[in-house]
Amino acid sequence: MKIEIVVGNIVKQPDIEAVVNSANANLRLGSGVAGAIHMAAGPKLEEDCKPFAPLALGAGLITPGFKLPNPWVIHVRSAHYINNDEPEKYMQMALESMLRLANDNDIRSLALPAIGTGMFKFPPILAARITCQVLHRADELAPFLQTVRICLTDAAMLELFESANAEVQMTTIG
């Protein structure tokens, strides 16, 4: 599986099958990336999510992309870093849920943001490490998946994720 790390707008990835939404428990329009995904997808996305709320910590859900250029949206719920005893565990579970949903739906390409680093206050370096660790085990959970694109907001986040990815790659190989 190929991991791409880019600075880019997650709602403008037309060559990707599913975008990943860092969702709140109620699966409602929020701010940041979740807000951008909901706005771009249109009101049907929130309507489609309603019956599945509240989404459990670490869980995921797949819905159509509606007005997005992507057929699917995978919603995952990580934990608030500050108000939770095991935020790293739930971040890992959310990312694993994302991979399982991709596999179960024969999705070959995903675009995800820096899960948890906005409203959930995850330290970006920790989020980057956990994300890269899970992605380097993706073949176990999602053998069908070919490409994962991590879409980040700026060069500083790009540098953090590239560094974490290189670090995880070194430990996996060595």
Question: Model-derived features: where do they sit?
Answer:
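Glycine-/small-residue-enriched capping loops at alpha/beta junctions
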Residues: 1-105
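Phosphate/ribose-phosphate-bearing ligand recognition and processing surfaces
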Residues: 81-174
